[in-house]
Amino acid sequence: MPMRNQVEKVKVLIEALPYMRRFEGKTFVIKYGGNAMVDEDLKSAFAQDVILMRQVGINPIIVHGGGPQIGLIMKRMGLEPKFIDGLRVTDEDTMSVVEMVLAGKVNKDIVNLINLNGGRAAGLSGKDGYTIQARKRTHVRKGPDVQVPEIIDLGWVGDVERIETNLLDRFRASDIIPVVAPVGVGANGETYNINADSVAGHIAIAMQAEKLILLTDVPGVQDKNGTLINQIDETDVDKLIRNGTVTGGMIPKLETCRTAHTGGVNASHIIDGRVEHALLLEIFTDSGIGTVLR
C-alpha cells in the first residue's frame, strides 16, 4: 500500500477520535429507509456503520420503513394501494399486510443483516412491551385545491401517543442493537400503521438521545438552487416551508427534526443514505455530509 494512502487512513482516525470520545455512552436513533435498504453494498455499509458505533460505545436504535416492500406484497396479493396527501390509506386488509411485511419480513432481514456482519441485533415492533402506544390519526385535508377543509378517514393510520422505554432501556444496557418496526398499538389493542420518521423522533425524545438521524434519498435540505444547506435551527423550518424551499416529503422530516429538538434531542440530521458509510461520514468527520438541525 502506498505511504500516502496509509497517511490518509491515519488522518481519518485522528479526525474521528474526538467524536468517538464525545459520543461514548450516548444514544443515537437512526431512521433507516430508502435506497440504503435496497442496494446490497449500501446495506452492508449501513450494518458495518451501526456495528462500529456500538463498538465505540454509542447506543444505536434503528427504526425502519418499508413502503416499497409493502407495495410489492400488496400487488402480489391483488390489493390496490391508496394514498391521500402522501399517507397510505390503511384498511383491515392493508394493515394485515403492513404488519406482516414490517414486523415479520423487513425487521428480521435488518436484524439478520447486522448479525451476519458481526453485530448483535434483535427486532421488535411497537406491540412488544407496549413500546409504541398510539392513537388514530385525524387527518384534515387542506390546500390550494381544497376549498373547504375536510376530515379524511385514513383507516388504521396512527400517531404516537407515548413511547414505553422499558425494552429499549434493557437493550441499551446490553450489547444488542434494537431494530424497531413502526407498528403501534392502541388503548384497546388496535394495530396502527405509523410513519417511521415520526416514530424515530418520538423514540429519540423518550430515550433522551443525543442525535436523531434520518436516512433519505437526497443529499439533505437544499436551497432553491439545489445547494445543500449544511446547518439550520428551529426558526429556519417555518421559513423554508413558507417560501417553498422545502416541499413534499421533506416537510414532515423537517418537522420531525424540529419536534425532536424541542423535546431535548441535541442534534437532528438528514443525510443521503445513497452514500456508502453515510452514518460514519456524518458523525465522525468535521464537515459531515448532510443537514443538521441544532
Swiss-Prot record:
SUPFAM superfamilies: Carbamate kinase-like
Superkingdom as given in the UniProt entry: Bacteria
Residues reported to bind substrate: G66, G67, R88, N193
E.C. numbers: 2.7.2.8
Residues at the site labelled Transition state stabilizer: K31, K253
First-level EC class: transferase
Pfam families for this protein: AA_kinase
Pathway the protein takes part in: Amino-acid biosynthesis; L-arginine biosynthesis; N(2)-acetyl-L-ornithine from L-glutamate: step 2/4
Keywords: Amino-acid biosynthesis, Arginine biosynthesis, ATP-binding, Cytoplasm, Kinase, Nucleotide-binding, Transferase
UniProt cross-references to Gene3D superfamilies, sorted A to Z: Acetylglutamate kinase-like
One GO BP annotation of this record: L-arginine biosynthetic process
Localization terms from the record: Cytoplasm
Family statement drawn from the similarity comment of this UniProt entry: Belongs to the acetylglutamate kinase family. ArgB subfamily.
Name of this protein: Acetylglutamate kinase
Organism for this UniProt entry: Magnetococcus marinus (strain ATCC BAA-1437 / JCM 17883 / MC-1)
